[in-house]
Amino acid sequence: MSSSRKRLGVFTSGGDCPGLNTAIRAIVAHATLSYGWEVLGILHATQGLIERKAIPLNAEGLGGMDVLLNMGGTILGAINKGDTLGHADEVIAGYYELGLDALIAICGDGSLRILHQLAQKGNWNFLAIPKTIDNDVALTDRAIGFDTAVNTVVEALNRITSTAASHDRVFVVEVMGRTAGHLALYSGIAGGADIILIPEIPYSIEGICQHLQKLRDRWGRQFALIVVAEGSKQLEEDANHPRHCSIGQYIADKIAQHSPIPIELRVSVLGHIQRGGAPMAMDRLLAAGMGNTAVDLAAQGTFGRMVAWQAGQVVTVPIADVVAKCPRHVDPNSFLIRTAQGLGIYVGDKPMLPYVDPTLCRDQVICAI
């Protein structure tokens, strides 16, 4: 895209999270103030393209846009359901009928996979910014929304711990993460969990019960905190006998059945509170840097890339590479897994590996957090 007046589209797709409005703010500010472009906000992502629903976004109309800095959710709305590819021709036509010169999507890995196909088929000038509280988008260390979600869960764990200790109860706290356990792992360590269960490392009810017994024998503690990602699985879970309740309730029921000692259990499913609220400082910084960079890429005529955060700075990576490697799982051999084990946290039936200095490690994937 040249520096002459162009029309840039932006939308948010997938589940909402803190920092979306902050990213929109950065895109609008840089595109309008630095390049003099027109920015259209597409309402409800691809549904807005189908229905040709868009609103003009500019600093004047948004009151200087300062209000967006700390506003949760998304002013553009979002969707995370529907048969988008089944309406591919309508979606693609919407891009052109709205007169877009380029489109920036703030999205997670599922939406990115679909949008990449649409962009290729429709020959769009397309760019992406990663957002997800699961932090499972590949080739980026952080996605917008993750840091705030971790802090939200940690605050909840702090509150639950005090009531658990007061009544000598074991709390099973279920957090989001169907395929990746980043949120459970980060918040569990920071929030003082005794047990962290994630999809990447199978657990056993026997291992959980033994750890709870160890807490009583070693410290005399009657209470405990179990953080479980919603996609966690047992060592030999029978796929032919699916659960008919939440993973948190399932684990609590199994502990009650198999524990050799009497345990008073409670289950807390944090649910959508993890998606809400004002973004924390890190998410605001990510959103600002990623939004600015996406606009600069459009100005340079560089498309088909996702803005990412690697080693403390904003970089760009091919969307095709991101899609091929999604979702980004927790590495069972990572530093944080070893840290949790070193703190005495049960993270599944996995032995603790010896420490390896990451600066001496040749395989960055294994050594990375």
Swiss-Prot record:
Its cofactor is Mg(2+). Its main location: cytoplasm. Substrate binds at T132, I133, D134, R169, M176, G177, R178, E230, R266, H272, I273, Q274, R275. Its EC number is 2.7.1.11. Keywords: ATP-binding, Cytoplasm, Glycolysis, Kinase, Magnesium, Metal-binding, Nucleotide-binding, Transferase. The record marks G110 as: Important for substrate specificity. The active site is at D134 (proton acceptor). It is an enzyme of class 2 (transferase). Pathway: Carbohydrate degradation; glycolysis; D-glyceraldehyde 3-phosphate and glycerone phosphate from D-glucose: step 3/4. One of its GO terms (biological process) is fructose 6-phosphate metabolic process. Mg(2+) binds at D109. One of its GO terms (molecular function) is ATP binding. Homodimer or homotetramer. Catalyzes the phosphorylation of D-fructose 6-phosphate to fructose 1,6-bisphosphate by ATP, the first committing step of glycolysis. The gene is pfkA. It comes from Thermosynechococcus vestitus (strain NIES-2133 / IAM M-273 / BP-1). It catalyses: beta-D-fructose 6-phosphate + ATP = beta-D-fructose 1,6-bisphosphate + ADP + H(+). It is found in: Cytoplasm. This is ATP-dependent 6-phosphofructokinase.
